[in-house]
Regions:
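Thiamine diphosphate
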Residues: 1-81
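Hydrophobic or amphipathic alpha-helical targeting/insertion segments
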Residues: 88-91
Length: 91
């Protein structure tokens, strides 16, 4: 049986294998399994910022400085829409 914890772990392993070393989290109850799994995996430098818009722009700046991808992760619902301005700015 596949659990939420297993799915989170497998997802983060794939992200690590793709070369992502930084994740910026905007925490919420729905993405808690990803935060817990990322910490347990130990493959990432993690930052937690409660404001999604600030988190996305922080990730964009970090990506520009390091010239490497930075993952962003938020809870479900409209929280994702707050990432949109930084995503647009990235392109």
């Amino acid at each position: 049986m596949t659990t939420t914890k297993n799915t989170a772990h497998w997802t983060l392993e794939a992200i690590a294998q793709a070369g992502v070393k930084n994740i910026v989290f905007s925490p919420g109850s729905r993405n808690a399994p990803l935060i817990i799994s990322a910490e347990a995996l130990g493959a990432f430098e993690m930052m937690v910022l409660g404001d999604e818009r600030s988190a996305a722009f922080h990730a964009l700046g970090r990506s520009q400085v390091t010239e490497a991808p930075v993952a962003i992760c938020c809870t479900s619902g409209s929280a994702l829409a707050n990432y949109y301005p930084a995503v647009l700015e990235a392109y």
